[in-house]
């Protein structure tokens, strides 16, 4: 059987048996997409088909795009990776570290040692974390009544650090701060900068922070898994459309086809349709580990309705680049060491394999993250892609 037959069979069966309400996936090489499929429904029960042009919430798949945009400004000398970030954003100076809580339940804070840098913000080593995988920060947000990051309110960024900058790796909101640095250095909003410098050159005309009416007409909604084959529609779950800040860590909507254009730009070492979007040496710099001996570990859930415990390829070494996860050992799917990847909260996933010159994009719209059915389905799809190389 061909890849198309095998992948169609795999994905359609997952919809037929109720594993996922809807799914889209594609495989691409440096020239173009050579498999794409869409199955199931955008909104469970409404009869509207999930198709490759369905608009989905990218969530943290936004991070790689923000990383690429920031690196354009590094190329131009408008931002520096290792200078104190407070030179661009004074509010990043003299941050506090949350040590825990005292007997009265109040936060215990101390001054951070060391300066936050842009490199740390892009690699999750700045000390900024998400509450979703950190119980202390769940408690801190409850105590202080700080909004969560998904609110896109500036107050959501004003949290202490979990550790001193550069001392370890923990997944967090650093890339939202990197987006703020881009805005300060470019004089544009994140969305306007992305449009001018990435989306227009790449032809990504279905990708934006703010949904157009036309995009909304093709949009899938997020479903919360209640059981093996039972879902609850989350009609209200949407990134604020009049945000205080555009969320570089997770605010974009897109299609798998649009995201594949970004994947191909990376596979082509920064070139898209004859335009040099990033220098080849910049793409190479983004594609290697920048966290030294730190490793990307299991993310232990502190908010079960948002995420399960999450780890890709348990037991394998994973680093982090600018801003992708970097696989350091060959994976059982066939993905080799040196490949780049990450994911979005509603169980969307991508990978970029420079060695074989291929990549893949997969999306469902299911929470919690690291869904017990969708993640294995994505890995099965990836395995088929490699079996058919």
Which stretches of residues belong to each language-model region?
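A short, polar/charged loop-to-alpha-helix boundary motif
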Residues: 42-51, 369-379
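Active-site SXXK
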Residues: 6-12, 25, 31, 57-85, ...
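Short, conserved catalytic-motif segment at the N-terminal edge
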Residues: 2-58, 78-80, 94-103
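Short, well-ordered beta-strand elements
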Residues: 34, 351, 357-366
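Short, surface-exposed beta-strand/loop micro-motifs that present aromatic residues
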Residues: 339, 346-355
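Short, surface-exposed loop or secondary-structure junction motifs
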Residues: 87-332
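Surface-exposed amphipathic alpha-helical segments
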Residues: 376-389
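Hydrophobic (often cysteine-bearing) scaffold residues that line and stabilize catalytic clefts
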Residues: 3, 7, 58, 62, ...
């Amino acid at each position: 059987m061909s890849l198309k037959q095998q992948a169609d069979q795999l994905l359609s069966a997952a919809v037929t048996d109720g594993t996922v309400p809807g799914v889209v996936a594609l495989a691409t090489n440096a020239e173009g997409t050579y498999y794409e499929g869409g199955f199931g429904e955008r909104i469970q029960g409404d009869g509207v088909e999930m198709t490759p042009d369905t608009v989905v919430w990218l969530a943290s798949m936004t991070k790689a795009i923000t990383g690429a945009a920031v690196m354009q400004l590094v190329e131009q000398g408008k931002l520096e990776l290792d200078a104190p970030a407070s030179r661009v954003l004074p509010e990043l100076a003299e941050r506090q570290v949350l040590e825990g809580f005292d007997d009265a339940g109040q936060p215990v804070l101390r001054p951070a040692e060391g300066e936050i840098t842009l490199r740390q913000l892009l690699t999750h080593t700045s000390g900024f974390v998400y509450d979703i995988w950190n119980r202390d920060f769940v408690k801190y947000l409850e105590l202080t009544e700080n909004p969560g990051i998904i609110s896109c309110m500036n107050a959501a960024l004003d949290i202490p650090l979990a550790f001193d900058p550069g001392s370890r790796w923990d997944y967090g909101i650093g890339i939202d701060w990197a987006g703020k640095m881009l805005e300060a250095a470019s004089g544009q909003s994140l969305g306007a900068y992305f449009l001018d410098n990435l989306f227009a050159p790449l032809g990504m005309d279905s990708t934006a922070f703010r949904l157009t009416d036309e995009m909304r007409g093709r949009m899938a909604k997020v479903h919360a898994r209640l059981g093996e084959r039972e879902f609850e529609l989350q009609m209200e779950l949407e990134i604020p459309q009049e945000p205080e800040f555009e969320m570089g860590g997770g605010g974009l909507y897109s299609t798998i086809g649009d995201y594949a254009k970004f994947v191909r730009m990376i596979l082509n070492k920064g070139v898209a349709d004859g335009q040099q979007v990033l220098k080849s040496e910049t793409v190479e710099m983004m594609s290697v580990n920048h966290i030294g001996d730190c490793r990307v570990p299991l993310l232990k859930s502190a908010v079960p309705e948002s995420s399960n415990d999450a780890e890709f390829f348990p037991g394998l070494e994973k680093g982090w680049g600018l801003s992708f996860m970097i696989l350091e050992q060959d994976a059982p799917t066939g993905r080799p060491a040196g490949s780049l990847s990450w994911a979005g909260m509603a169980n969307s996933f991508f990978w970029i394999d420079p060695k074989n010159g291929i990549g893949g994009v997969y999306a469902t719209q299911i929470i919690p993250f690291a869904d017990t059915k969708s993640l294995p389905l994505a890995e099965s799809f990836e395995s088929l892609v490699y079996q058919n190389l």
